[in-house]
A protein has these predicted regions:
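Gly/Ser-rich oxyanion-binding loop with an adjacent helix/lid
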Residues: 1-51, 84-89, 95-213, 370-373, ...
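Short, conserved glycine- and acidic-residue-centered signature motifs
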Residues: 55, 99, 329
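C-terminal nucleotide
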Residues: 1-36, 61, 65-96, 193-351, ...
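Short, flexible active-site loop motifs that bind/organize anionic cofactors or intermediates
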Residues: 131, 295, 360
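FabD-like malonyl-/acyl-CoA
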Residues: 138-139, 360-365
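Structural signature of FAD isoalloxazine-binding scaffolds in flavoprotein oxidoreductases
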Residues: 50-69, 188
Length: 401
């Protein structure tokens, strides 16, 4: 479907006209960008590793109308309307960490293709939970990018190229470090395997697969702690992995030979500490698990996929250590994982999801247990904490209505 359903369009039109006035007979552009779930490859993307991700049935949906001004005005349902001027597309230090920085960053990227930026009004809703590890920011970036691409008459942008633009925007304009997986999953759509060793041209493959057809539901559970608050903890993961790589004169772990790492471990431990070494161990182990899980999914072997997913979850907890930020009495992610394991009772699989340190956990739940699982997790963690998601086949796009 390349047009919004009737209810979504009515909501968007109401929001737009409340903020910007009647649309009248002006041409309307519809924009859609899904959220994503990391299916496998926990913190491997920023080291040039492998990932499997899927776009989800939650999304940024918006409508845009061109104007004669040099301003982009944005109405985001539930948040104050804001605007930026197009006088300069340079990084604004005062905007870092704000929604305006994403607009300016994507405008800079699209304008760099050789097109003239023009003003427009954009109203959108977002059903992607914020701070829950489903990449709401990547969906917003992709939505802005597709809107600008179409409104400004830019050449067609390939999904991975748009993802790279979005990543640069988040890194440089918003000021948050991130790999390419979030943006690539949002832009590609469906279930996708990604190899990030070649940063300029990542390799991607896609697979049509519905977990429900294999007897399992993809359930994400909000743990009750927003991972946005753990930016420093998140940033320490790639920093420590890359500290290890730097000891070999490299920038990412994908460039380091594992045998060389093994030979130098005592020296690395003495200089960088245990955690950096453990995180490097996780990278290579998890990277191998990604490839094995992709092979299992392609073979339709869901049981093997689940065995490997449980191994991945253990590696994240023990070696990557992105479940608990600081040991203490409050450990919401570990608490949620324990409760999920308790309900699953050896069936399915559960793991930390995405960046970690809060946000969400991911569970593959047998279909006959889904209602019980969601009811119990909601009872323990709060109504609406657990939700059953489906893989969506559409990546970010824009279409004239």
């Amino acid at each position: 479907m390349t047009t919004p359903d009737e209810k979504t369009f009515a909501t968007l039109t109401k929001l737009f006209e409340e903020e910007f006035g009647p649309i009248g007979d002006r041409q309307v552009l519809y924009v859609h960008a899904p959220g994503r779930s990391e299916i496998s490859g926990n913190h491997t993307d920023h080291e040039g590793g492998h990932v499997i991700a899927g776009s989800l049935d939650v999304a940024v949906d918006g409508i845009a109308v061109a104007t004669d001004s040099n301003k982009i005005r944005v109405a985001d349902e539930g948040y104050p309307t804001f605007e930026i001027t197009l006088d300069t597309l340079d990084i604004q230090e005062s905007e870092k960490g704000t929604s305006a920085s994403l607009v300016r960053g994507m405008a800079h990227e699209i304008a760099a293709l050789g097109v003239e930026p023009h003003g427009f009004d954009f109203a959108f809703t977002c059903s992607v939970p914020s701070g829950g590890g489903l990449s709401s920011s990547a969906a917003v970036e992709a939505a802005y990018g597709r809107a600008m691409e179409t409104l400004w008459g830019a050449p067609a942008i390939e999904p991975v190229t748009l993802a790279q633009m979005s990543q640069r925007t988040e890194n440089n304009y918003y000021g948050k470090p991130c790999g390419l997986m979030d943006q690539a999953a949002v832009c590609l759509g469906g279930l996708a395997y990604m190899d990030f060793e070649d940063q300029a041209q990542p390799k991607t493959q896609k697979l049509e697969l519905n977990f429900e057809d294999h007897g399992y539901a993809l359930v994400l559970v909000k743990v009750g702690a927003d991972h946005v608050a753990a930016t420093d903890d998140y940033a320490a993961v790639p920093r420590e992995m890359q500290d290890v790589a730097a000891e070999f004169g490299k920038t990412r772990l994908c460039e380091v030979n594992v045998a060389d790492f093994d030979a130098k471990l005592p020296e690395l431990r003495a200089k960088l500490g245990d955690r950096a070494c453990l995180r490097a161990v996780h990278y290579w182990y998890e990277n191998g698990l990604v490839d094995k899980r992709w092979a299992a999914l392609n073979a339709g072997d869901i049981d093997q996929f689940l065995v490997l997913t449980r191994e991945s979850g253990a590696s994240s907890a023990m070696y990557l250590q992105n479940v608990v930020a600081k040991l203490g009495s409050q450990q919401p992610s570990m608490y949620a994982l324990a409760l999920a394991e308790h309900v699953l009772d050896g069936r399915g699989a559960v793991r930390i999801h995405g960046g970690g340190f809060g946000g969400t956990i991911q569970a593959f739940v047998p279909l006959d247990l889904v209602d019980t699982f969601i009811t119990k997790m909601n009872g323990w963690l709060g109504e609406g904490s657990a939700r059953h998601y489906a893989i969506s086949d559409k990546g970010a796009y824009a279409a004239w209505l």
